[in-house]
Amino acid sequence: MLTVRYIEKLWDARKYSRLLEELIAPRVEAAAAGELADTPAAAAAALALVRLDELHQPQASLCPRLIRTLVALQESDGGWGDVATTALCLRALCLQNGQGQAIERGLAYLATLQQPAGIWPKIPIRRMPEDALVSAFVLAQLADSERFRDAVRFDAALARFESHRWSLDQGAQSLWDHARLRIPAMIATPAAAESSWS
């Protein structure tokens, strides 16, 4: 188990790749670990914030430094280098009811890259082919965020995954299953709402 002290030790030593590997290994997000490898500092900072929040340590002295790192690493287009890392960074910045321009720019980045079918490409160019693993990762990170659901075509993403769920590979299926758990019940079951008792 990673402790606050151990996370801080790896962060201060700038061992971002190692920190990322150790943070992601026991998590469902490990299915998309390769998607985060090109941006180890941003991904490690974001996942460290998520883990510290899970440990009920959002007041740890490391947290403000991690947040400043994420804000500093945000690119001019609003993303953090790629779609998956952007989703993870947004999740981290939204913790503890986070607010700010960095979040708004990141959400706009994801909304811009979302394809008409409702999912995202692996490479951050809108005309690139859709990628189920990256899209499932995005939803696994942000499906419970009302700001995210309002910023993107969330219903289109849900419909796309529901209609193609049997064709997903194991990694994408695992992330999609996790994402479905994060979707508020009223949204997750439109069929149930239609057939509810009157």
Q: Residue spans of the language-model regions?
A:
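Preference for long, amphipathic alpha-helical scaffolds in soluble/luminal domains
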Residues: M1-S198
